[in-house]
Every structure is written in structure tokens, then in C-alpha cells.
């Protein structure tokens, strides 16, 4: 009777584990990216306030660490880690004869970065212009956003479970650059900045505004994940492992790049 009760309890736990979906994470080394002087933080001035990406690496529990160490393939996926953190399979003496292999699904397991490069002129979003050819003195202009602009990034290739992969890449890029990155940001109409640019007498003045972005390149690894139980022993087994090259453009949130040009 006790054995029957234990089997029911274990089945409930395993059903709970299987019932979850999948998502992503990242590995990376912190190498802060220095912003050029032409890139200015306009977060406070933006008339369309943006919520910061609330991403952080999920720490595995002791139980999860034990499982991850049994896997021959590196696993960084925070959703998979979350599922393992929230599950528990007790080492009960009644489980000595228990054997089970549970399929947890195919997951993006990890992302490895091969390069991170900035493009400070990723997307032109605004031009402020003044004609001072008939002027009798210098004229000063400053940045004023004339129309609302949405800046979007994305992956450079089609891959399974896009949202999971994007999250892993984003985590990696944010850790490497120490910059506020997001796959979509908005600059509101009427956003201004106080920095002035002088248009000389007899000249035309153009103030170009660009949204900067980070270009990330690397490799994402997929695999079928199984939870294997043999008595009191538990392990993760990953089968049919595949890797795919991937890239992504990730806009820099709350920052703009300014370029001024004067001509006769």
C-alpha cells in the first residue's frame, strides 16, 4: 500500500515537471563597451518612457545543480532551470526499485557568443535642419524628435523557439557590454536634448539622429532533454544535440547617436 502511494506521488511530481514549456539563457564574459562621445543618454527626456528589461541569470537550487552536473551538455536555459528548481524527487527508501525516463521536451540549451560589435548608426530616426544662409550670425539648434519612432531588432536567421533564443542572446549581450539592451524600444515625439550645435553664418545645418544597436554573433545549442530516475539516483540525459549559427541586432535602450553637418 505504501509502495502504491509512493508511485502515485512520484507520478504527480513528474507530470508537474513535464507540464512546463521552454525558454532561454546565456554564457558570456563581462567586457564593458565604451560609448563614443556622440552617444547620449536621453532616457529622462524620452516622452515615451520605456520599462527596463528585467533579466537576470536564475540561480539553480542545490537539487538543480546536482542534476545539471550529470548532463554531458551544458545547460543555461533559465526556464529549464526554473522548472528543475520548482520540482523535487525525494530519495525515499521506497524508490530503490524505481526506474523511469521522462521526456522533458526539446530545448534551446545554451548560447555561446563569438562576437559582439556596436553599430552606432543602426537606424536613422530624425533630422533637424536650419537654413542660415541668409543669417547675420551663428544659429544654434538642438535635437527635437519630430515623429515617434519604434526601433526593432531581431534574429538574423529563423530558428526554433525564437523567444527562448532571443532571451539567451540578450542575457549574454547585456552581461558582455553592461549596456541597457532590448529588442524593441520607442523614442516619443517631442523628445528633446539641451546640447546645442552651431550653424555658421551663410550655412545649412543638419543634425542627424541615429538609434544605436549591438550586433551579436554566436551559436545556439538544442537538445532533447530526459530526466532519468534509477532508484535514488537522478540525472539529466540530453540526446540528438544540434547546433546552429545565429546572429541578432539588439537596440540600445534610452541612448541616441548624434551627427552634425554644416554645408554652404
Report the location of each language-model feature.
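A short, flexible low-complexity segment enriched in Lys/Arg and Gly/Pro that occurs
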Residues: 1-7, 135-139, 143
